[in-house]
């Protein structure tokens, strides 16, 4: 499924450490995977749920389907442990350490979409501030009251696909609003979206498209130059809040 299992494990371990760096202990992490990643970090608040799903193909649609099926498995386990809210986290992103405490302080809310946060370029180790709509760019983007996801838990695997399904992050907030259970904007920056590590599905898809088109390659180079003017280094406070540290891809 991945081009580099070693890199996947390194990225996942950073995400796991970030997710478990909460200021509140009132949380559980459910890792849904085909194969358990090889990491040196462990805690009793992490549960590994290995699933026997068909391996996805190399295309984007197949990978998205695989991700949504894993999310469904995670939902069912979250229900079994009586979770109040759930948040789906991609295996390479980093999240704010204040999320669990904030949710615990607002137990009756439908949930939140993470519209604000950062993009992070691994190769350059730079951040770009995102002031809006970050929840449309990454799957690490919503905290949802578990009861609102009952329809998704009851879907047959063949029905798990983009459409009237909350599990596709681009549609999540809009569908919940249509159902009469809207989410609120999270009132602080909640996620660092890792964009260019090579294991990111959206980024990889765009990179392939650029390499297959000369004009797109030029535009990508211009975009890269522009990025240097709109990015910032990682500060100590951001590093501490999000558990972000450099990854050696070798």
Feature-to-residue mapping (PLM):
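Conserved short acidic donor-positioning loop in nucleotide-sugar-dependent glycosyltransferases
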Residues: 19, 33-37, 91
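Active-site-proximal specificity loops/subdomain of glycosyltransferases
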Residues: 35-83
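Short, high-confidence coil segments that cap the C-terminus of an alpha-helix
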Residues: 83, 108-110, 181
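Conserved catalytic core of nucleotide-sugar-dependent glycosyltransferases
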Residues: 96-165
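Short beta-strand-to-loop acidic/aromatic patch adjacent to the donor-nucleotide binding site
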Residues: 81-94
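C-terminal catalytic/acceptor-binding lobe
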Residues: 157-250
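Short, acidic, metal-binding catalytic loop of nucleotide-sugar glycosyltransferases
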Residues: 8-26
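Short, flexible/disordered intra-domain loops and linkers
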Residues: 1-10, 58-65, 157-165
């Amino acid at each position: 499924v991945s081009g580099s299992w070693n890199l996947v494990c390194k990225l996942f371990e950073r995400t796991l450490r970030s997710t478990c760096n909460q200021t509140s202990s009132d949380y559980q992490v459910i890792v849904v995977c085909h194969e358990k990643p090889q990491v040196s970090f462990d805690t009793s608040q992490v549960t590994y749920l290995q699933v026997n799903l068909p391996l996805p193909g190399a295309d984007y649609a197949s990978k998205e389907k695989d991700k949504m099926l894993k999310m469904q498995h995670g939902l069912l386990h979250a229900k079994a442990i009586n979770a109040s809210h759930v948040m789906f986290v991609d295996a390479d992103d980093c999240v704010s350490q204040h999320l669990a405490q904030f949710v615990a302080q607002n137990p009756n809310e439908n949930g939140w979409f993470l519209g604000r946060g950062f993009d992070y370029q691994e190769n350059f180790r730079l951040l770009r501030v995102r002031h809006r709509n970050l929840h449309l760019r990454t799957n690490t983007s919503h905290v949802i009251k578990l009861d609102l996801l009952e329809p998704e838990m009851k879907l047959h695997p063949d029905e798990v696909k983009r459409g009237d399904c909350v599990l596709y992050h681009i549609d999540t907030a809009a569908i919940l609003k249509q159902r009469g259970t809207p989410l609120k904007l999270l009132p602080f920056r909640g996620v660092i979206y890792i964009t260019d590590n090579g294991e990111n599905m959206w980024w990889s898809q765009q990179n392939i498209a650029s390499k297959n088109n000369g004009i797109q390659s030029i535009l990508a180079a211009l975009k890269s130059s522009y990025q240097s003017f709109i990015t910032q280094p990682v500060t100590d406070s951001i590093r501490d809040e999000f558990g972000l540290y450099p990854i050696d891809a070798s």
